[in-house]
């Protein structure tokens, strides 16, 4: 009977000690796995910052449940990370501000940390004066406001803070002192505003050098006056050989210009792009070919002569337009515009593909609804063609009587018309 009591006592002591202490052994385990283990052990919700990466090595023979949080934070600190906030807590890069030290970790011994970066003099215990709160963003993407909110928080406190976004529900998760969070909604109301959109309508075309197009019905009326750039009230003189090659026009110049170009045999419309983008966001459109260019070739000892090795890089060749518009409060539009018109050359003088490149890149200030004309990019094409009667054209001396040679010179100028219109937010 006494022997049975002793066995029961030893069994109860073993179960009791197992329920109050844990043996933790981790060798080069992922830091995220360590966080997952802690969350399962304590039942706490934890948000992990994207910059939390690395491994951790921990050996501990006696960690009691009431000391598990302090133990977990100490391991994080030893690896230059930290856990801040209440529920949910946030794992982030360690910030030494707003931390207290104690000489030793209570009720936990035989612990080893494989990291020389751990600060000497004791363990860390955070001051839990940060509060974690979520904020619903209604008009812009939450991730676009992270840097702005971080600036607001850090300019009002020197304590540790963190700002994350939840893209699926468009939320901001902010961990900061409570007085900062109380003032944050008022600040968010000044930056969480509806954003205007900009409609960019373009017309990329080329005309033969010296030819003038009759645009008088498009720009000669009162609605089509020139707003600036050249001293004329008719788009015809702007596009003629005697006129300039830039200008800003009021009225529906773009739409009527398309009709005039279609009826002129000496003009060619290359592209009519339409781009709708948010103010402050880049928009682009392109059409063309993806052409391979040889960037390297090996035919020596390291490669089979019958099957030489070469590297190829593909690049887009065609018509493209890229814009970056910003709508101002007064109705102006600051517009960064880049337009390219690339084509493949018919020349066979080179061993690889030759491309003809024409591009315009500029920054302009337009009023809502105005049309901008840019141009003056001239392209020269010289072609020669030999033809003759087969066999007879190869006879010496008299062969010239049965052959002919034709040379042609083409000269064209590229122009770009761009109209910017503000689409007000509802």
From Swiss-Prot:
Query: What does this chain do?
Result: Acts in the assembly and extrusion of the bacteriophage by forming a channel across the host outer membrane. This channel is just large enough to allow a newly synthesized phage particle to pass through. Extrusion is a process of concomitant assembly and secretion and takes place at specific assembly sites where host inner and outer membranes are in close contacts.
Give the record's membrane topology. Single-pass type I membrane protein
Subcellular localization:
Host membrane
Q: Could you tell me which cysteines form disulfide bridges?
A: none
User: Which protein, by its recorded name, is this?
Assistant: Virion export protein
GO CC term (a single one)? membrane
Membrane-crossing ranges are: 317-337
Q: InterPro entries this protein is in?
A: Bact_Secretion_Sys_Channel, GspD-like_N0, GspD/PilQ, NolW-like, NolW-like_sf, T2SS/T3SS_dom, T2SS_GspD_CS
The subunit field of the Swiss-Prot or TrEMBL record says: Homomultimer. The channel is composed of 14 G4P subunits that confer a barrel-like structure. Interacts with G1P; this interaction results in a complex that spans the inner an outer host membranes.
Say which family it is in: Belongs to the inovirus G4P protein family.
GO annotation, biological process: protein secretion; viral extrusion
Which Pfam families does the UniProt record give? Secretin, Secretin_N, type_II_gspD_N0
Q: Which UniProt keywords apply?
A: Host membrane, Membrane, Signal, Transmembrane, Transmembrane helix, Viral extrusion, Viral release from host cell
Q: What is its main location?
A: host cell
The record lists the organism as Enterobacteria phage f1 (Bacteriophage f1)
Question: Where does the signal peptide begin and end?
Answer: 1-21
Species lineage: Viruses, Monodnaviria, Loebvirae, Hofneiviricota, Faserviricetes
